Amino acid sequence: MGNSEIFLDSARVPEHMQEKIKDALRFLEYQNGYKILFAYESGSRAWNFHSPDSDYDVRFVYVRDKDNYLSVSPARDVCESFKGIAKGTAYEDDLLDIVGWDLSKALHLMRKSNPQLIEWLNGPLPYYIADPAFNQHLLSISRRVTRMEPIYMHYRGMATGNFREYLQGDEVRYKKYLYVIRPLLAAQYVYENMSIPPVDFKQLREVTDDSQTDEFRESLNRLLKYKTEAQESATMPKDPVLNAWIEARLAQKVDFKEGPGPTSEQVTKLLDSTFNVALSKWGN
């Protein structure tokens, strides 16, 4: 990783944490011998409803030396061991949750319209971008190959599962409401626009405002205020207004119709070309 001139909103990511995260990413590069292509914040700080003690959910994609891809026993395609690697070093921090995917895995999941990867690429808080032109290329091809129905079903499934698991009691955690409301609004946006929804929750609310009653807006504004001031574990009494809105949205059935996308052969050609460009540039 070279020096990055990216500076983020310090209200969401304080400057000292920005530097610590960039240093931690350089440390991972050195320890693992790969090249990080990009790194983004992916959690509540990216969604813009973080608590004072929220984690920093850093997600990155990397590429290895090309020889690693020629072996019948390739290296692991995921880096999930940051806490273990950093233990006892200057980079150890309980608030840092850092996970990376090999570019080959990322492109394979892009073919499957993986919502996590799509959110990373569209995230508002990049910690590092190795090559802005290549990053823009990744974003461009993701928009060409991503199918909206899997994205829609992902958000609907997330909302349904979180509602059943977390919002059935009389006392619930603030953030669990948002883990249902955000994906419901994201699913609405996908259905209405056939495109990727904004990652920032404030922007998402604005572009889906027609589905929100005044009473719901008041309850949601109150929830957001408490959520951003309270600790992650803080709870609240169940809100009947929020629950009624959620239940009504979950009960809605839609007929999702999406036009034809690129053929499997076209997608393969795009992804293979992208992978080869990265190997030529960073695969030594």
Predicted regions: what they are:
Residues 1-40:
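Helical scaffold of the NTase/Pol beta-like nucleotidyltransferase catalytic core
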Residues 2-11, 166-168, 255-260, 284:
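Glycine- and acidic
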Residues 43-96:
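Catalytic metal-binding acidic patch
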Residues 62-67, 109-116, 161, 186-187:
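Short loop/turn segments at secondary-structure transitions that flank enzyme active sites
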Residues 73-157:
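A basic- and aromatic-enriched beta-loop-alpha substructure that forms the phosphate/nucleotide-
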Residues 133-264:
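Conserved nucleotidyltransferase catalytic core and NTase-mimicking acidic/glycine-rich helix/loop elements
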Residues 259-284:
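Acidic, carboxylate-rich catalytic segments that either coordinate divalent cations
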